[in-house]
Amino acid sequence: MSDKKTNNVYYVDASAARGGNGSQEKPFKFINDAAAIALPGDEVIVAPGIYREYVCPENAGTADAPIVYRSEKPLGAVITGAEVLTGWTKHEGNIWTARVNNGIFGTYNPYTTYVCGDWYFAPTVRHTGAVFINDLMMYETVTLDECIAGEADPCAYNQEESKYKWYTEQDGDETVLYANFQGYDPNKEKVEISVRRNIFMPDKNGVNYITVSGFVITKGATTWAPPAAYQDGLIGPHWSKGWIIEDCEVSNSRCCGISLGKYLDPENDMYFYTKHVKSPTQMERDAVCRGQYHGWLKEKVGSHIIRRCHVHHCEQTGIVGRMGAVFSTIEDCHIHHVCNSQQLGGAETAGIKLHAAIDVTIRRNHIHNCIMGVWLDWEAQGARVTQNLMHDNSRPEGREPAKGAMFSNDVFIEVGHGPTLIDNNILLSKVSIIIPSEGIAVVHNLIAGSFGLINSGVDSIVNDQREPRYTPYHIRHRTEVAGFMTILHGDDRIYNNIFLQKYPVDEEKKDPASPENSVVGTACFDIFPSYEEWIANFKMDEEPDMGALATYHFGHLPVWLAGNAYFNGADVCKHEKDALIDTENTATADVVEKDGKYYLDTNIYSLLGDFKNGILNSDILGKAFEPEQRFENPDGSAIIFDKDYFDNNRGLSTIPGPFADEEAAKAVLF
């Protein structure tokens, strides 16, 4: 790599003749030709066209001189991991067949490589490759007979799409494909198969400060990306610092769209899956500690920006990242239809799934029709989920979970110690927030769904004994580990939210310890003490007695609630102060789409009356218990919650929910 700053401009055009030199007069034909030589300060301008290649940047930029790859026309340059497959012949009925010589795949054949690994709970029967008809990712079958039948998958979110099937087998040095195109002639349609594993991703660590702007990035044969493994995607920085991925459309990944994930550690890569003898949770702890040894530091990894991207139709995650996403920002993105086929299943599926989201900001995104919206697992210390619109992150009515599938919700914070802040969001799915964690602040949200996994979802019972799940917490605003602790539960703050029971209560799903709890409100926090009740146990005016206090060292932590509004029977915590409880009116809140823009249709703001509260700030929220860190900005400065969903000023006092006033709630949400 070179830090030499050159400020060259290279041009690329898929329609160019071969042998170009990157000049405007003689552009390169392939983006990777420019990626092999671009140095700090250089810009690569790519003409509209389809680029069937893997782009592997060789050199890093610098903080003041990034290497910029730019589509000349926004979304005009399409980089794809797929190739067109022609020459289909009729097999029988709607079934066609085609053959591909395996030489095209090199050392990685997606049609012999299975989706599998740590935390993968579905059967290991799907390949990393995929077949597409007119940009629709078809559904893989386990047998040819299933492909021939062409029946809808009862678990798929889209029943009609699930009738488009494909099946593969090997015959010598050829991959044989069968496909049910439901009456379409594949020789008259655009039929492609994914060939390349990645689209735009370095093959080594430390290729820092790259900007990728305005591309369509699509159709890669990506692999399952669990947290204690190398995590790939269609595009990603591969364990580096300072990437910007902006104004891109990222879609049709077999597994993950954008990866901000973990490097390859040969001694801890799918350890549980390949060696069996240690638990995957233990290997996650090892991944954190080994990461410290391998340079997981603020100065070397993370601080990426993902902005204004359209991420959709990926089958594991839209955006994934273990440890490599620290100090990053994901903003103004539209993320939807993730893990909808239900062909893949496991504990790593969501619109955004991050482990160790230290000081990560997720803001102003629209996330919908995903198996989950945002899932922050382990070490979401300093993470902030703010000003997002989330809805329909649940299985459609009548769809059952496939084998290995996860539950659904808008925001899931798992086994973290905080401080994690969820503020100024619109959360309209059936289950809004799942928190088998501690140190969570839920502030100024509109919440139409339930809380779930309260005082649950953390430890396992193995050999008739409790096996606590110890997870790390960190030096404030750093990656260095400060300690490990199990989850005591509690230490939560719930202020100035609007709760409404939007969906009917399911009498069989009224358990707040369940991920499918159907009861909206805060009564589920009754099991935790108030601060006054909790602190009294420690007898602060007496000499400490280690034995006597041990009970409370491992007991529940306190909770704080105030200023919330409750509608349609949403229940209320006994510790709540200054609540508005409306038992007379019926509140409504729905997202409405008009001409591609999204609005909120609600009567709530006419029901709030004169109910107001004071402005919150970091000092009022206090510090999360284990890391002893405030709910504050990544730079350590205080947050004053005087701005709403749109950054409108709230004034000297505030109403609950994400909007400063009724008029603000009428504006375009996204």
Task: List PLM regions with ranges.
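Extracellular polysaccharide-degrading/modifying enzymes targeting complex plant/algal/animal polysaccharides
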Residues: 6-239, 244, 249-296, 464, ...
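Beta-rich catalytic cores
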Residues: 231, 315, 348
